[in-house]
């Protein structure tokens, strides 16, 4: 099934140059007077090699049909991440290198979709947004309002995002999983 490059998301499985690749990160860039393009970080599922590729916005991307099974993230143990099938309660574990940047959004009991190709788990698809708790940031300013000023905040998963100055430690925020950006308070 062909989709435009602009609809590519982290966690998708695509066919590129005749081989299966997992999409790890996607960045839509629009440099000055030039045409917009999509900079994607891909991992070859056969060899495990990581590389970046630049797609033009209208380029058709062949999304591979995989078995998508709804699962719930349970916990991680080092580089192993454990998921439970919500239909039959079977557990599956995936390695950190299979998950890529998606590990920065995984919290206990998060409902996700795990993709299987030929019976082997090849990646996950995250929800559009996740709610994460701020564990470290600079103190908030009194009477701070939303503006173009931001500060870095470390979230419970280790992800660092730029947040407005009124966000304090311990607050839950909503983060966009495609961009890795702050959206709002939860």
Curated annotation (Swiss-Prot):
Biological pathway: Protein biosynthesis; polypeptide chain elongation
GO molecular function: translation elongation factor activity
Keywords: Cytoplasm, Elongation factor, Protein biosynthesis
Compartments reported by the entry: Cytoplasm
Pfam families assigned to the protein according to its UniProt record, in alphabetical order: EFP, EFP_N, Elong-fact-P_C
Gene Ontology CC annotation, any one: cytoplasm
Presence of keyword Protein transport: no
Top-level division of the source organism's lineage: Bacteria
One record GO biological process: peptide biosynthetic process
Signal peptide start and end residues: none
CDD domains in the cross-refs: S1_EF-P_repeat_1, S1_EF-P_repeat_2
InterPro entries: Elong-fact-P_C (IPR015365), NA-bd_OB-fold (IPR012340), Rib_uL2_dom2 (IPR014722), Transl_elong_fac_P/YeiP (IPR020599), Transl_elong_KOW-like (IPR013185), Transl_elong_P/YeiP_cen (IPR001059), Transl_elong_P/YeiP_CS (IPR013852), Transl_elongation_fac_P (IPR011768)
Chief place of localization: cytoplasm
Family listed: Belongs to the elongation factor P family.
Physiological role: Involved in peptide bond synthesis. Stimulates efficient translation and peptide-bond synthesis on native or reconstituted 70S ribosomes in vitro. Probably functions indirectly by altering the affinity of the ribosome for aminoacyl-tRNA, thus increasing their reactivity as acceptors for peptidyl transferase.
PANTHER family: ELONGATION FACTOR P, TRANSLATION ELONGATION FACTOR KOW-LIKE DOMAIN-CONTAINING PROTEIN
Protein name: Elongation factor P
Organism field: Acidobacterium capsulatum (strain ATCC 51196 / DSM 11244 / BCRC 80197 / JCM 7670 / NBRC 15755 / NCIMB 13165 / 161)
């Amino acid at each position: 099934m062909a989709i435009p490059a602009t609809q590519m998301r982290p966690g998708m499985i695509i066919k590129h140059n005749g081989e299966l690749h997992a999409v790890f990160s996607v960045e839509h860039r629009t440099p000055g007077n030039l045409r917009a393009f999509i900079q994607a970080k891909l991992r070859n599922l056969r060899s495990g090699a990581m590389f970046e590729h630049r797609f033009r916005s209208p380029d058709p991307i062949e999304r591979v049909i995989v078995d998508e099974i709804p699962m719930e993230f349970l916990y991680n143990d080092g580089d192993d991440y454990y998921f439970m099938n919500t239909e039959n309660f079977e557990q599956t574990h995936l390695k950190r290198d299979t998950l890529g940047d998606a590990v920065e959004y995984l919290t206990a009991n998060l409902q996700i979709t795990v993709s299987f190709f030929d019976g082997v788990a090849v990646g996950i698809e995250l929800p559009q947004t996740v709610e994460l708790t701020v564990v470290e940031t600079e103190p908030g300013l009194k009477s701070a309002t939303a503006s173009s000023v931001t500060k870095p905040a470390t979230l419970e998963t280790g992800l660092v995002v730029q947040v407005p100055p009124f966000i304090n430690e311990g607050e839950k925020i909503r983060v966009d999983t495609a961009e890795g950006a702050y959206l709002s308070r939860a």
